[in-house]
Amino acid sequence: MDTPRVLLSAVFLISFLWDLPGFQQASISSSSSSAELGSTKGMRSRKEGKMQRAPRDSDAGREGQEPQPRPQDEPRAQQPRAQEPPGRGPRVVPHEYMLSIYRTYSIAEKLGINASFFQSSKSANTITSFVDRGLDDLSHTPLRRQKYLFDVSMLSDKEELVGAELRLFRQAPSAPWGPPAGPLHVQLFPCLSPLLLDARTLDPQGAPPAGWEVFDVWQGLRHQPWKQLCLELRAAWGELDAGEAEARARGPQQPPPPDLRSLGFGRRVRPPQERALLVVFTRSQRKNLFAEMREQLGSAEAAGPGAGAEGSWPPPSGAPDARPWLPSPGRRRRRTAFASRHGKRHGKKSRLRCSKKPLHVNFKELGWDDWIIAPLEYEAYHCEGVCDFPLRSHLEPTNHAIIQTLMNSMDPGSTPPSCCVPTKLTPISILYIDAGNNVVYKQYEDMVVESCGCR
């Protein structure tokens, strides 16, 4: 083989290799390692079609490092996340009493017993708990009066108030109460009001064990605007209706008033599960889950100008794409059980007769676990199938459905078939956090399909 032909072949080979990706980068030599590193990074940036910058969240997650914010940018930790919606604050820990209500009524629903038949529910379908926001008055020793403050602004005047109770955990006394001077009473009043709401008589001779004291405060909540509720606990010796003037007139032999702290009602050194709890029982009209989502949107808008920012949850209600029932943008999207079956409704299976089919609902996949405490998932079922002639009696067709099915059997092109829809629905209990960070139990109607029919 002569030399010109060899040179020509080498030129064609080099031209071919030069067009291959990465050959130029590999063939460029550098006199120093720093120049080579910079050239490599520059080539990678040009290939990606962007300038060098801090890694994205997804890239940082793969590298196991948190992305470092630039000085001119707001720190990422201060931006709202999907798991912590704007305006909600830290995660709310439900009180054990509310969890017990949910467990009790959920079991009753499985047994076919409506929660409104329970005496403790007071025929209510909504039970809201409010945590005490007051502080001990340390300037008074002994503590003869103690105020409890509750923000009840989330209650609606459209709801019927059927009951309210104040639950106070009385710790075991650390010291004897002293010589008895008659019966020992703890009384509950509205702040700045002489109206006695409820009272309890304690035995000064014995040492009562720790436990909950429940006071009926329905009258106090019924006669005031639903914004702030202030209740005052007092302790006194003697008869239940004895006033302060009568107690002072008894002379120096009257023992000092009992200290509420020594009675076990002090707030200091108290875990969250032992804090005072206001429980309100209401009966509201039929309310669906989308109404709750609108309240979540309203609370986010009220949180501040950044509450409705792009990528936050919930989105602003005025936005054209505001669909709060969809998963939040920051969440990992998954195919739900319903979505995975959506493509199987054609062909042979679509000709099955109308019947109840499984539909597993996962609130976490919907992005609702930010405000729903329990249940995080349940079996809702759905109706699927055809309503063809002749209609089966167990489908309980209406007269209109029968006529429509007959017309469809004679001329399918002119009349559509009747639809397979739920004919009986049952409720489920949901424990959730409202827009005011209060834990609420509510019985939602029409959540589970019990039977299907043609309509």
UniProtKB/Swiss-Prot annotation:
Basic residues bias locations: 330-351
The UniProt record lists the keyword Transmembrane: no
Residues bearing glycans: N114
SUPFAM superfamilies: Cystine-knot cytokines
GO molecular function (one): cytokine activity
InterPro entries assigned: Cystine-knot_cytokine (IPR029034), TGF-b_C (IPR001839), TGF-b_propeptide (IPR001111), TGF-beta-rel (IPR015615), TGFb_CS (IPR017948)
Gene3D superfamilies the UniProt entry points to: 2.60.120.970, Cystine-knot cytokines
Residue spans of biased composition, Low complexity class: 77-91
Signal peptide bounds: 1-22
Role, per record: Growth factor that controls proliferation and cellular differentiation in the retina and bone formation. Plays a key role in regulating apoptosis during retinal development. Establishes dorsal-ventral positional information in the retina and controls the formation of the retinotectal map. Required for normal formation of bones and joints in the limbs, skull, digits and axial skeleton. Plays a key role in establishing boundaries between skeletal elements during development. Regulation of GDF6 expression seems to be a mechanism for evolving species-specific changes in skeletal structures.
Subunit structure: Homodimer; disulfide-linked.
Disorder named in the UniProt entry: Klippel-Feil syndrome 1, autosomal dominant: A skeletal disorder characterized by congenital fusion of cervical vertebrae. It is due to a failure in the normal segmentation of vertebrae during the early weeks of fetal development. The clinical triad consists of short neck, low posterior hairline, and limited neck movement. Deafness is a feature in some cases and may be of sensorineural, conductive, or mixed type.
Protein name, per record: Growth/differentiation factor 6
Gene that encodes it: GDF6
